[in-house]
Amino acid sequence: MKISCLPVSLFDDICSGRMSLQAWAETAKEIGYDGIDLSMLMLTAHTETYLQRIRRELDRAGLPVVMATTYPDFTHPDPKQRQREADYLARDIALCDQLGIRYLRVLAGQAHQEVSEEAGVTLAAEHLRQADAVAGKYTVQLLYENHAKPGAWSKVDFSYPIDIFFRIFDQLKDTGILLNFDIGNIVAQNREPLPILERVIDRVETVHISDMSAYGKFDPVEIGTGVCPIQDILKRLKGYGFQGWLCIEEASGHGLAGIASAWRYVHNLVNEL
């Protein structure tokens, strides 16, 4: 199992330009990571010259970009906005293909009060299926996540409640969409991750390793200092034969120190399996 990192603690630095993507990749390589993850928020254009420059810089750093994260809002009550979201996602898929990014994490949408659970499930599943058809034109694998709330949104994820997540997940089983399984988001709902993992393990392609301060509370902390049963999850994955990427979602707010300690913790756990 290889290890990459989505550097949530560095989002402000990277999105503002204080830290370049090349510098992030070079730093991750020095720490020991096998790859890096990016947010679409970090990419400021989709012109060919810009993307060629970004790819050259990342290639010089010598680490693959494993996963990009994006934030489609397919449960928006306005049909015109939902179409915009679909078009934005199609662009993101093409952009990932051009940058050589293997995985693109996708979401259901936000929990809009005007949209019922039944309507939201239908809308999310329909649009994700359409996005899968777009991804099929490229070398990009879409990954759906049991997600909570990104900074890019004002509301929590519509499918944050695990029962809603399962309803959408079940409607995607005949598509090419696989899963990015997030440990911390389940703990934040005061649920145990292992039983949830058992339900979806045959569709898990990557794992977001995150940690929370307590069950029932969305409060990210340094990886290995919280209550998430990370070691138990890794043992079960190994027993299943999982050989995919462990994508650390480092959101403790401790910057590079937190990102380095997260790698040491997960690296040691993997070596002990």
Give the label of every model feature segment.
Residues M1-G32, S159-L273:
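Histidine-acidic metal/acid-base catalytic patches
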Residues M1-R102, A125, G136, D170, ...:
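N-terminal pre-domain/capping segments
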Residues S9-F11, M40-M42, Y71-F74, A108-H112, ...:
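Active-site-proximal loop/turn and secondary-structure-junction residues that shape catalytic pockets
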Residues D12-D13, M42-L43, K80-Q81, A119-G120, ...:
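A generic structural signal for short
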Residues D12-S16, P77, V115, A152-K155, ...:
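A generic structural signal for short coil/turn motifs at secondary-structure boundaries
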Residues E26, E57-R60, P79-L178, A188-Q189, ...:
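Active-site acidic/histidine proton-transfer and metal-coordination neighborhood
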Residues D37, M67-T69, R105, L143, ...:
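Conserved beta-strand positions in the central sheet of alpha/beta enzyme cores
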Residues D73, P77, H112-S116, F218, ...:
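Short amphipathic alpha-helical segments at helix-loop
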